[in-house]
């Protein structure tokens, strides 16, 4: 009896998480453009309030990016570890 695991699916899922993390930069920049376009709400695009909001937004996106990227790396590592263990166990039964 053969059991087939799809370790490639686990790796692909980890890669997808990491790609989504990387795409956050484009979303971040789009939000910053919108904030600057609505600068009057903040008292002008160059105002302290506007710049502080953009700074805080950048920090928040950085935390999200780092956590998502790290999670994707962990998922990929787990898939790789499972594949190696499965291969080692499988070859020991041969």
From Swiss-Prot:
The keyword NAD does not apply. It comes from the Bacteria. Keywords: Secreted. SUPFAM superfamilies: EsxAB dimer-like (SSF140453). Its main location: secreted. It is found in: Secreted. The keyword Ion transport does not apply. InterPro entries: ESAT-6-like_Myco, ESAT-6-like_sf, T7SS_ESAT-6-like. It holds the Pfam family WXG100. Coiled coil: none annotated. GO terms for cellular component: extracellular region; plasma membrane. Belongs to the WXG100 family. ESAT-6 subfamily. This is ESAT-6-like protein EsxN.
